[in-house]
Amino acid sequence: GYGAGVYNAAAVTSAGARAWNEPAEESDIIFLGAMWTLDNWGEDMLALRRGEKINYFETDASVVPVRASVVDTCPLGNYVLVSPNDRHTILYGSQEFGTSAGAPINPMTVRWADQNDFREWTPSAANTSGEVLLTEGSSLIGAIRSRNAINLWTDQAMYTQTFVGPPFIFNFTQVGSNCGLIGTHACVDVDGVSYWMGDNNFYMYDGRVRTMDCTVRRYLFNDFNMTQKEKVYAGINSEFKEVIWLYPMAGSDEPNGYVIYNYEENTWVYGKLFEEGIVTVFQDRNTFNNTITIGRVSATDSMYVYNNEPNGIYTGNNKNLP
């Protein structure tokens, strides 16, 4: 049909050309995935599905488990984060103030609610809500809390966001160019040092942006499915002083490869997780005693949450996990 690949063109001049009533085998149209971001609001939780409104889960709302409720007064957004200390709820990529309810999201707008109130998004002299439109890049990709600041990335640049109080509330400083983030969850922070994956390199920020000397860079990016790059997931394994990135290798639509950087020894390793399995999330040991991953070990398996190496035993389904 229309809209997918070359239509009504001679096959001898256009590869993949189709005539009337010849369906396309595949589409060249790429849609963004349904990416979720979560953050704590005290003991409660804020959750955002990209392109929608914030959902609020109140843990003490009832003795019976309840569903999260939509924050109706919130604009549509792409990524949510709660600013430390000053407690502002921030959207990265948001509808701009003054636009209609059905207005599109401006992917370069940072917008925040009133202090301690994630329901009040209308700026006034009586509150601290506001917004800023950043300029370097075409879309805000992700953000993480770091030491005394929030570090945020577009597809082209890195900024720092610091709380300065009224009247501006936040100060935004561009600290790097040509160092954009490859995907929303492709960044981590370790003791005030941020590490992230770009479209063709790895970077760190310790007061200034540095390109990391990755010894496996060529092998990794030559075997990478860039159409699924937003699924890259970065995690920390603090016990072994490692940062791990899960990424989709060529031919896979889900993360099935990994690259690990040891920030204490300055070494790199990479490899394939499973022959047919995937791992989509890696969480450091904090709430639980071991690292937590989500994935499956074969194409026919269901997705599971893995408690890796429980009690120091390396057996069972955990044997194939990195």
Predicted regions and their residues:
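Structural motif
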Residues: 53-58, 96-118, 155-163, 199-207, ...
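Beta-strand initiation motifs
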Residues: 61-68, 119-127, 166-171, 211-213, ...
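Beta-sheet repeat architectures centered on beta-propellers
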Residues: 1-2, 24-30, 34-37, 138, ...
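Surface-exposed loop and turn segments in beta-propeller and other repeat-based domains
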Residues: 1-26, 115-136, 215-228
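Surface-exposed extracellular loop regions of Gram-negative outer-membrane beta-barrel proteins
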Residues: 150-176
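A short beta-strand motif characteristic of beta-propeller blades
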Residues: 18-26, 65-72, 127-134, 170-176, ...
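Surface-exposed assembly/interface segments
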Residues: 1-80
